[in-house]
């Protein structure tokens, strides 16, 4: 034992003189494990970088092909040889800039990939091929030396145990072998560990350098791309300026087209209801330089306003509900109302997943943009119920204030969530909700009523559309009922509230407190079972806003033609006084007589007629505006016995035959309405006659000549007789009146049927012309 201790001490001294001692041997485990890990990581990283490099090479080639295609595409928009192909020069130039930029950037990417391959991949490949092998050789030498040391040490231990039975020489020989193995193992271990350490250090330094160079390569790549983008910025600004001019030209063209295309389908469109024509206003007693417009012209003005391009702001999405309704003069935004009516159709309300299935997002976006721009005001040509339901949800979602408002959120939710306060009674809860809904603004309430009515009807078809009240509430509630600060709990409460409102639609909206709120014209239909939404296809009174009928035209006076048969006039009455003769004539076929003393007025006189025995529907003491179109005059014409002057646009009409001769001064103030023309056998203008033109000299009735016609007051009950268009022109040179040639068949009486007997004596119609007007009468060609 004493010798062993001495030998062990000598070995320690020998090992202590070396640079690397046995105390570093525990590092062997750490370093060998590090080398194994580095070998695995290096192999994986090498494969990834190689794959990345190949992928980038393919990307570079594809991007270069893309740049070439863009350059070719730019040539389609401009051709310097043929000016007719210059579709859009700014677009062609921009495509050219983009194509060249992509090509340059891909060249930079090519350089970037080469730098990575040369530095990082080369370093990793070198480590895998040489350094890893050197490390493995050092490890093998270390293991071999350790085995020799372990064998010598074990042999020495065995001899020591048997030292009493063996010679001392064998023990000394074993001790020398152990000393040699220990020295050899110490040298190999020091050398192997040093080699491993050098390999690890080299890998770390080279990897750091490769990673740093990669970052610099990325920096150079992006810097070159940025520099190139900045270099083309000036050219891009020039093309932007040219494109702005191009857009301005497009806007001008669009305005010209829109004035023709907009509201092209006037007869079939249900967008705007035409108002009825305004009643004729009574003329003032004072002279007016501009006459009142005729009813026909007012109709034309209304039609022009209807087909005109909508001006001002037509935006619907993102606008306040009150702003839209005030702008459109409606209770509910028109396009939303039409959408609800569309969804109420049987084929749409039974669509599976209505209000849940999403449509084509591009179609929805295009529809919203066109509605905001005012290009679409109807749903003609749209048959996708999912598109329209999503359109309605998008409108509700983009409202700046939700449909049920922020202020009423907690009030509505509390009615349903705190149902214990109402003993869980649906009727009491519904009444509480009714009290809250009364506080809604008018547009919000009416739209909510129509919307909930639609949802209730959809829920009744849940067996077909798979949309129960719960499903509908989940899809609609987040768009119509939410607080200012959203959270999960508020959404859950809103879903429960909307589900209750849909389920109890009849109890809520048929409540007496709000059933007639705001006098909603599109009330809930459906009778005792509740009803659908406003004006739906299920029943109820049609909303006048959806009327497609144009305003009724003013009634045209009925023309009366005397046929070639004698009038049924009592013979005895013709021999009586002039008043009784006039009365019997009026009761048979002639109009009521004109008063002998009409009110006198220098301009726009008012004539009052009283005819208690007339068969027409003329009210007594009817005031008539003589400035309106002669077709709408309420006074019957009569033959004038003398020349009279008038300030109206029409020629004078004669008095009834039974009337006595009227002084010229009084008749100058009479304003006639209808011209009686085609007179035969003209006589002196100053000659008067008291002979009844409808009777012979013996007092018996006689037929009427072919050249006489007159208007009776229109009773607005009969249909006007078809008329031919006579060739007759009346020109008025008065510059202060709105006269025009009577070329329309509505302005002339129909021709008379031919008769055999001529009229005996009728005076021609003449008129005293003032200095400001001249009226010329051309004969009517009755051929």
Swiss-Prot record:
Residues 527-539 have a biased composition (Gly residues). Residues 706-738 have a biased composition (Polar residues). SMART domains: RhoGAP. Residues 319-509 form the Rho-GAP domain. It comes from the Eukaryota. It holds the Pfam family BAR_3. CDD domains: BAR, RhoGAP. GO terms for molecular function: GTPase activator activity. Keywords: Coiled coil, Cytoplasm, GTPase activation. Residues 283-299, 568-589, 599-630, 641-651, 661-698 have a biased composition (Low complexity). Residues 138-188 form a coiled coil. One of its GO terms (cellular component) is cytoplasm. The record marks 356 as: Arginine finger. Transmembrane segments: none annotated. It is found in: Cytoplasm. GO terms for biological process: small GTPase-mediated signal transduction. Rho GTPase-activating protein involved in the signal transduction pathway. This is Rho GTPase-activating protein gacR. It comes from Dictyostelium discoideum. The lineage of its organism: Eukaryota, Amoebozoa, Evosea, Eumycetozoa, Dictyostelia.
């Amino acid at each position: 034992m004493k010798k062993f201790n001495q030998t062990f001490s000598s070995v320690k001294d020998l090992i202590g003189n070396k640079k690397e001692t046995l105390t570093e041997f525990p590092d062997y485990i750490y370093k060998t494990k590090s080398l194994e890990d580095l070998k695995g990581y290096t192999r994986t990283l090498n494969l990834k970088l190689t794959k990345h490099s190949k992928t980038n090479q393919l990307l570079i080639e594809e991007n270069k092909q893309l740049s070439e295609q863009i350059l070719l595409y730019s040539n389609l928009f401009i051709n310097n040889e043929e000016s007719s192909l210059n579709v859009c020069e700014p677009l062609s130039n921009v495509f050219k800039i983009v194509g060249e930029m992509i090509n340059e950037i891909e060249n930079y990417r090519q350089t970037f990939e080469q730098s990575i391959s040369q530095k990082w991949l080369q370093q990793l490949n070198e480590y895998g091929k040489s350094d890893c092998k050197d490390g493995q050789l050092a490890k093998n030498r270390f293991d071999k030396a350790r085995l020799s040391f372990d064998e010598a040490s074990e042999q020495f231990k065995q001899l020591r145990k048997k030292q009493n039975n063996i010679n001392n020489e064998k023990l000394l020989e074993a001790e020398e072998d152990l000393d040699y193995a220990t020295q050899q193992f110490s040298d190999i271990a020091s050398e192997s560990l040093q080699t491993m350490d050098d390999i690890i250090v080299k890998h770390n330094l080279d990897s750091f350098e490769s990673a740093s160079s990669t970052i610099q390569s990325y920096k150079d790549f992006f810097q070159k791309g940025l520099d190139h983008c900045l270099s083309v910025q000036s050219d891009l600004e020039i093309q932007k300026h040219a494109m702005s001019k191009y857009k301005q030209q497009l806007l001008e063209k669009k305005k010209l087209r829109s004035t023709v295309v907009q509201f092209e389908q006037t007869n079939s469109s249900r967008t705007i209801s035409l108002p009825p024509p305004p009643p004729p206003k009574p003329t003032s007693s004072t002279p007016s330089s501009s006459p009142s417009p005729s009813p026909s012209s007012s109709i034309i003005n209304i039609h022009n306003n209807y087909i005109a391009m909508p001006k001002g702001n037509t935006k619907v999405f993102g606008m306040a509900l009150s702003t839209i309704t005030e702008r459109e003069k409606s209770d509910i935004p028109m396009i939303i109302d039409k959408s609800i009516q569309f969804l109420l159709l049987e084929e749409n309300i039974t669509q599976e997943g209505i209000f849940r299935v999403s449509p084509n997002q591009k179609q929805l976006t295009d529809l919203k943009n066109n509605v905001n721009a005012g290009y679409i005001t109807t749903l003609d040509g749209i048959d996708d119920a999912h598109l329209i339901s999503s359109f309605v949800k998008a409108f509700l979602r983009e409202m700046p204030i939700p449909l049920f408002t922020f202020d009423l959120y907690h009030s509505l939710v509390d009615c349903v969530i705190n149902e214990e306060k109402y003993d869980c009674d649906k009727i009491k809860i519904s009444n509480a909700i009714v009290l809250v809904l009364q506080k809604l603004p008018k547009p919000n309430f009416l739209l909510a009523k129509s919307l909930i009515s639609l949802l209730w009807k959809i829920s009744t078809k849940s067996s077909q559309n798979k949309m129960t009240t719960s499903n509908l509430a989940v899809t609609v509630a987040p768009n119509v009922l939410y607080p200012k600060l959203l959270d999960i709990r508020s959404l859950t409460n809103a879903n429960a509230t909307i589900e209750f409102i849909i389920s109890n639609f009849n109890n809520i909206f048929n409540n007496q407190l709000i059933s007639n709120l705001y006098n909603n014209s599109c009330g809930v239909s459906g009778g005792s079972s509740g009803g659908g939404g406003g004006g739906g296809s299920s029943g109820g009174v049609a909303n006048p806003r959806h009327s497609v009928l144009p305003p009724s035209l003013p009634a045209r006076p009925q023309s009366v033609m005397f046929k070639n048969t004698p009038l049924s006039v009592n013979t005895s009455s013709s021999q009586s006084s002039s008043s009784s003769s006039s009365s019997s004539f009026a009761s048979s076929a002639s109009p009521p007589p004109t008063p002998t003393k009409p009110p006198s007025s220098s301009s726009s006189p008012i004539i009052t007629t009283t005819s208690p025995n007339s068969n027409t529907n003329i009210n007594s003491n009817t005031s008539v505006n003589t400035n309106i179109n002669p077709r709408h005059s309420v006074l019957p014409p009569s033959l004038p016995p003398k020349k009279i002057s008038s300030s109206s646009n029409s020629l004078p009409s004669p008095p009834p035959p039974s009337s006595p001769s009227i002084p010229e001064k009084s008749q100058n103030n009479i304003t006639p309405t209808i011209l009686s023309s085609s007179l035969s056998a003209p006589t002196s203008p100053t000659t008067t006659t008291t002979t009844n033109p409808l009777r012979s000299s013996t007092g018996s009735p006689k037929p009427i000549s072919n050249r006489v016609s007159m208007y009776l007051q229109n009773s607005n009950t009969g249909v006007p007789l078809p008329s031919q268009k006579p060739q007759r022109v009346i020109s008025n040179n008065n510059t202060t009146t709105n006269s025009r040639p009577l070329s329309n068949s509505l302005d002339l009486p129909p021709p008379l049927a031919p008769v055999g007997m001529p009229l005996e004596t009728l005076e021609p119609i003449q008129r005293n012309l003032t200095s400001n007007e001249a009226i010329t009468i051309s004969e009517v060609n009755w051929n």
